[in-house]
């Protein structure tokens, strides 16, 4: 299935889009922080703006994106959105060459808008083009591919912008990735529109309210959406905390951060693929809550491993190299916890995505995905704001966040218990 005409061009299309989003954003953050010459407070403020601009468009535009993906043939929209992305990347290249921060921030917002339009289309494509028995496998590949693209894009963005001629290389790679994604979009097979008579609501906020109401009227869809929101909030918190965790808790040089990013993404990918492998042999919905409980256990162990970290440099300003850290057994324990909790997250999120697509009305599946995106974005923002407030007031530290995350995971496991009786089509 993976290399079939109905899946592989689609995989290329979304993979390089997610890769580009995160390469662009992280390269811009590094450029602002290290190369802009701005005062630290102003540089930090613009970095936070950059981190938020990519997610902000999901709130107003997701519902309209869902309506468009239900009304029009999806192969046409794939091509239109990838043409939009390629056209955006041309000025991005020149803005990077000039080192123009504000134009890059504006272009990042437009890139986020393109991603918000693309996301419901991506997940609505799966149940339309794949057979029901392939839903679990398709979602496993999409989940693994998305997270690998996000992390590799982030790591490459952090690296490219710092090498000689880094701005030129960053802009050129972004343009090249957009071109590859565009080629993939034109290879996606033609398909009919699911709801051609649907009227597009021009009022963005009313449209958002309508798609949210339609999803929350259904108990199963509500459980899926809130369960997935926990996954994305947790993942966003880990990615945000890893740099500070490495510096302040492990006293490690910055080179450890991308390694932890890679371990986390590898864990999500492993869990996603493991889920579809098990799903070929037995029902996986009964395993969703146990996977979340295991995720909470590994998160608690990460908390205790960090609390017991005893390697502290003699010089308060010194940081340990990776070669020095690998001799410390606790680093291996922390690394294992990170991979295993990420694998549990990948495992439990795949069947929730598949069940959401399976249970939604075929004519409304893109709008159900749009509602999911809105709630996911809200959960990510809520988690970030709540954590920042708790840390700013000294209520918790970096390590204390792990306890909160573990508690949320455990409560979510209890909340998702009613889904254990649901069944997905199997091979």
Which role does the model predict for each range below?
Residues 8-25, 51-88, 103-162, 223, ...:
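Substrate-agnostic recognition of the 12-TM MFS/MFS-like secondary transporter fold
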Residues 1-8, 191-227, 249, 315-327:
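Juxtamembrane intracellular "pre-TM" segments in multi-pass secondary transporters
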Residues 83-99, 293-327:
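C-terminal ends and interior cores of transmembrane alpha-helices
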Residues 27-58:
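Extracellular/periplasmic helix-loop-helix junction of adjacent transmembrane segments
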Residues 27-38, 93-98, 151-174, 248-249, ...:
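Transmembrane alpha-helix termini and helix-breaking/packing motifs in multi-pass membrane transporters
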Residues 124, 128, 174-200, 306-310, ...:
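Helix-loop junctions on the cytosolic side of multi-pass membrane transporters
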Residues 101-108, 112, 137-195, 267, ...:
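Hydrophobic alpha-helical transmembrane segments
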Residues 40-48, 254-262, 370, 402:
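Small-residue hotspots at the loop-to-helix junctions and early N-terminal turns
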């Amino acid at each position: 299935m993976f290399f079939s005409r109905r899946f592989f061009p689609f995989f290329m299309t979304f993979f390089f889009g997610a890769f580009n989003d995160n390469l662009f954003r992280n390269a811009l953050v590094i450029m602002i922080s290290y190369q802009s010459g701005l005062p630290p407070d102003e540089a930090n403020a613009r970095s936070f703006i950059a981190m938020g601009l990519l997610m902000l468009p999901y709130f107003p535009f997701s519902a309209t994106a869902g309506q468009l993906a239900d009304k029009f043939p999806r192969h046409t929209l794939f091509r239109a959105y990838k043409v939009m992305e390629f056209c955006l990347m041309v000025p991005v290249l020149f803005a990077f060459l000039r080192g123009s921060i504000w134009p890059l921030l504006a272009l990042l917002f437009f890139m986020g808008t393109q991603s918000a339009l693309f996301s419901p289309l991506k997940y609505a494509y799966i149940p339309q083009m794949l057979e029901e028995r392939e839903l679990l496998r398709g979602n496993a590949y999409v989940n693994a591919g998305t997270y690998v693209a996000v992390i590799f894009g982030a790591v490459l963005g952090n690296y490219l912008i710092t090498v000689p001629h880094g701005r030129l290389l960053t802009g050129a790679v972004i343009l090249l990735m957009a071109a590859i994604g565009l080629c993939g979009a034109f290879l996606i097979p033609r398909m009919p529109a699911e709801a051609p008579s649907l009227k597009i609501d021009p009022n963005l906020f009313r449209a958002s309210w309508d798609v949210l109401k339609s999803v929350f009227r259904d108990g199963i869809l509500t459980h899926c959406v809130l369960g997935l929101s926990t996954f994305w909030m947790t993942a966003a918190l880990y990615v945000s905390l890893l740099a500070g965790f490495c510096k302040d808790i492990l006293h490690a040089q910055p080179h450890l951060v991308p390694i932890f990013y890679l371990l986390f993404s590898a864990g999500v990918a492993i869990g996603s693929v493991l889920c579809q492998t098990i799903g070929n042999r037995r029902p996986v919905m009964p395993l969703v809550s146990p996977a979340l409980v295991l995720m909470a256990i590994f998160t608690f162990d990460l908390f205790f491993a960090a609390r017991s970290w005893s390697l502290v440099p003699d010089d308060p300003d010194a940081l340990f190299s990776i070669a020095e850290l690998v001799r410390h057994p606790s680093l291996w324990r922390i690394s294992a916890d990170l991979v295993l909790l990420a694998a549990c997250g990948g495992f439990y999120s795949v069947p929730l995505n598949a069940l959401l697509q399976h249970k939604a009305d075929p004519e409304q599946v893109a709008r159900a995905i749009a509602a999911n995106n809105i709630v996911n974005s809200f959960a990510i923002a809520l988690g970030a704001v709540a954590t920042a407030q708790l840390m700013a007031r000294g209520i918790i530290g970096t390590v204390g966040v792990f306890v909160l995350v573990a508690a949320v995971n455990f409560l979510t496991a209890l909340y998702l218990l009613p889904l254990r009786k649901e069944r997905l089509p199997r091979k």
